[in-house]
Regions:
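Conserved catalytic-core motifs of GNAT/GCN5-like acyltransferases
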Residues: 145, 158, 163-178
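Acyl-donor-binding surface of acyltransferase catalytic domains
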Residues: 1-34, 184-187
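Conserved glycine-rich acetyl-CoA-binding loop
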Residues: 114-128, 137, 141, 148-155, ...
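Non-catalytic, surface-exposed connector residues within folded enzymatic/regulatory domains
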Residues: 66, 120-121, 176
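Acetyl-CoA-dependent GNAT
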Residues: 3-5, 35-40, 44-116, 127-129, ...
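Short hydrophobic/aromatic beta-strand or adjacent loop that forms the aromatic wall/cage
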Residues: 82, 177-181
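Positions that flank functional sites
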Residues: 72, 149, 172
Length: 190
């Protein structure tokens, strides 16, 4: 019976394509992170945080790469299968990650760390937090795309266990740069 229920739940999730990441039972992994004597607070992103996320993107991306505030608001307020986590230092947003779950895959849509706060483990911390959510949601895969020219990010993702599985030709529309598809297989605990 349990096997049948699991199959039905998996089938339903694939049909609907959503699991609730706003459920009060969603365990929020860690509430803070310490690096170089700084204590960062972890916060689940809400619609009101969209402007802060746009500002963060502006520090790291070219204007044509920035997700609009309206899209981020919609992602955080209406899509129950999306999750945004922010890291704050003294109430100042310094990093965020966006992800969504569909079926057995957790996909990172966005990871930004403000220059000046990079290379302090913040990106790695956020990736680990989303991975724990993915494991709690019984995901088998953790995926993302990265610019072919972004060697620093690729190094981080490889360090985290992601493998390059393909090239998406001209994936980034602003300059037609190829994107590398990367996947990490997740091992579910019994």
């Amino acid at each position: 019976l349990k096997n049948w229920i699991d199959q039905l739940q998996s089938w339903w999730t694939n049909i609907v394509g959503q699991v609730s990441l706003r459920d009060s039972s969603l365990p929020l992994i860690q509430e803070s992170y310490t690096s170089q004597e700084r204590v960062y607070q972890l916060k689940v992103g809400q619609k009101a945080d969209a402007k802060s996320l746009v500002n963060l993107q502006e520090t790291a991306y070219s204007p044509s790469e920035i997700w609009p505030e309206s899209l981020l608001e919609r992602e955080m307020s209406t899509k129950s299968n999306s999750l945004y986590l922010l890291l704050l230092y003294q109430d100042y947003p310094v990093a965020f990650i966006g992800a969504w779950i569909k079926g057995d895959n957790c996909h990172v849509s966005n990871l930004v760390v403000r220059p000046g706060y990079q290379r302090q483990g913040l990106g790695q911390f956020l990736l680990n937090q989303v991975e724990q959510v993915a494991l709690n949601q019984n995901c088998h895969y953790y995926s993302l795309e990265v610019r072919e020219s972004n060697h620093k990010a690729q190094k981080l993702y490889h360090k985290q266990g992601f493998e390059t599985v393909g090239v998406k030709k001209e994936y980034y529309s602003n300059n037609r740069e190829d994107g590398l598809a990367m996947v990490k297989q997740l091992i579910l605990k019994d």
